[in-house]
């Protein structure tokens, strides 16, 4: 046992804290902490400061609760003061010093880095544990924006992904992943469209860019800059059968630099972007110069607003600290939408859950402006929807009962804007957090066509109900 393991074990015994409780607080599986205590293993060097700080806080809190500060000082040869903050600092320094001694005396030191910085995973359980548990924990410990490359085809993995348990924790630092996609490989029909959509929704705190990958699919690499690289062997079903893990930073970054050159702009098919970039590329101007639209709304309903709302949105833009260009954009979009609603064809897909939430809280996001409609404004909005849909019979509504989508209703966060020539996704949740993309723009004509076709087919799904002007009025009168 090394110095770090000895100290950690002694602290656990002194505080009598349960290993399961400690693991839950620190964010690591109990097997990892057990190995740190008994097997001479150490937390990853990059993660160690955060791990030690978390451990120190836990132990200090327990010592104060148990009123054992004086005994701790005698047992661990520590001096006062004995308040919780000071105890935490003392324990952190003890752990830090023990970690350094242990690191210098194990095969993880710099002299043996070439031998110890690689390992091979051969069993499915180990491979799954690495990607599902160990890798996310490692990314959570990083104190910097995370840049990741994955040369493999996302569509090859979609069929095996499960979202039943949901996410336990979301990233607080920006995570950006460049990933491969091959529409001619595992994406030969439209079945992958909802799977890809659910994937983006499930990881809506991560920004993805997808690149056509036929030229690099053979590499089978997953690389986290400044951290770790994984070279994978895939079986005939595109499942990872062997994972070769590299943690030597120099090797990892050499791989990253070489592989990153394969992700060229000409191969970009789906791109995460912010509001400024979306506007620059015409998604808030030329996008509306068409006459056919498919719009799937995942939050509120910012369309068919009564005229008196537009000045209030403009004022809200100013009140929320946007510059005058946002107020001008809101004014322009208001006029543009009024013209579109008069005669163009619009298919609105509205989630039942989001519709009920809008009726309850009235929140909409118009462009980038968050606005809460009052009950009276919501009533005017509904009346205006009825009036405009009667005036323009090309406006159709499809209510998607997302409660019938087993384990999927918590996974629909992105709204879809499509004119069959250009398509982008909007992430309403991003306006309430600090990570994740605001938008995805779809740059592949083939992908736009397939998504358009999928939305057309969605109209005939059992969980999708059609409402034209008359049935909408009947529904309103009833409820």
Label every PLM stretch briefly.
Residues 1, 35, 45-112:
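Short amphipathic recognition helices of helix-turn-helix/homeodomain-type DNA-binding modules
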Residues 1-19, 25:
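A short, Lys/Arg-rich alpha-helix, primarily the initiator
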Residues 12, 36-40, 59:
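DNA major-groove recognition helix of helix-turn-helix
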Residues 17-20, 53, 209:
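Intrinsically disordered, low-complexity, charge-biased terminal/linker regions in eukaryotic proteins
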Residues 27-46:
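Recognition helix of helix-turn-helix/homeodomain-like DNA-binding domains
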Residues 119-464:
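Hydrophobic protein-protein interaction segments
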Residues 473-479:
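Hinge/cleft segment of the Venus flytrap/periplasmic-binding protein
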């Amino acid at each position: 046992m090394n110095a770090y393991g000895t100290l950690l074990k002694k602290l656990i015994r002194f505080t009598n804290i349960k290993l399961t409780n400690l693991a839950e607080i620190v964010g690591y599986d109990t097997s990892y902490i057990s190995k740190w205590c008994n097997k001479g293993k150490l937390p990853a060097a990059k993660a160690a400061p955060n791990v030690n700080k978390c451990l120190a806080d836990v132990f200090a809190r327990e010592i104060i609760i148990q009123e054992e500060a004086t005994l701790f000082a005698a047992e661990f040869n520590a001096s006062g003061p004995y308040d919780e903050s000071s105890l935490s600092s003392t324990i952190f320094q003890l752990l830090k010093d023990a970690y350094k001694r242990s690191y210098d005396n194990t095969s993880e030191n710099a002299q043996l880095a070439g031998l110890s910085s690689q390992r091979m995973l051969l069993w499915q359980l180990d491979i799954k544990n690495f990607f599902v548990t160990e890798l996310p924990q490692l990314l959570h410990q990083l104190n910097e924006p995370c840049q990741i490359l994955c040369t493999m085809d996302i569509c090859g993995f979609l069929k095996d992904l499960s979202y039943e348990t949901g996410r336990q924790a979301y990233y607080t630092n920006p995570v950006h992943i460049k990933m491969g996609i091959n529409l001619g490989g595992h994406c030969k029909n439209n079945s992958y469209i909802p799977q890809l959509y659910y994937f983006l929704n499930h990881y809506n705190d991560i920004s993805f860019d997808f690149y056509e990958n036929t030229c690099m699919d053979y590499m089978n690499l997953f690389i986290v800059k400044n951290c770790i690289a994984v070279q994978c062997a895939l079986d005939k079903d595109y499942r990872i059968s062997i994972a070769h893990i590299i943690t030597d930073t120099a090797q990892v970054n050499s791989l990253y630099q070489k592989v990153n050159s394969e992700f060229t702009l000409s191969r970009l098919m789906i791109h995460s972007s912010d509001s400024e970039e979306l506007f620059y590329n015409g998604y808030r101007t030329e996008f509306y110069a068409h006459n056919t639209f498919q719009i799937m709304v995942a939050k509120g309903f910012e369309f068919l607003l009564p005229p008196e709302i537009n000045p209030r949105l403009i004022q809200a833009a100013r009140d929320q600290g946007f510059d005058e260009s946002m107020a001008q954009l809101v004014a322009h979009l208001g006029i543009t939408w009024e013209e579109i609603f008069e005669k163009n064809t619009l298919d609105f897909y509205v989630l039942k859950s989001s519709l009920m939430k809008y009726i309850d809280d009235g929140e909409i996001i118009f462009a980038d402006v968050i606005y809460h409609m009052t009950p009276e404004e919501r009533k005017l909005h509904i009346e205006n929807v009825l009036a405009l849909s009667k005036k323009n019979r090309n406006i159709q509504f499809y209510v998607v009962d997302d409660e019938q989508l087993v384990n999927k209703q918590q996974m629909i966060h992105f709204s879809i804007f499509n004119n069959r020539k250009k398509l982008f996704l909007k992430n309403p949740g991003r306006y309430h957090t600090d990570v994740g993309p605001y938008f995805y723009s779809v740059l592949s004509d083939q992908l736009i066509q397939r998504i358009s076709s999928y939305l057309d087919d969605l109209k005939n799904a059992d969980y999708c109900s059609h409402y034209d002007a008359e049935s909408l009025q009947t529904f309103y009168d009833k409820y």
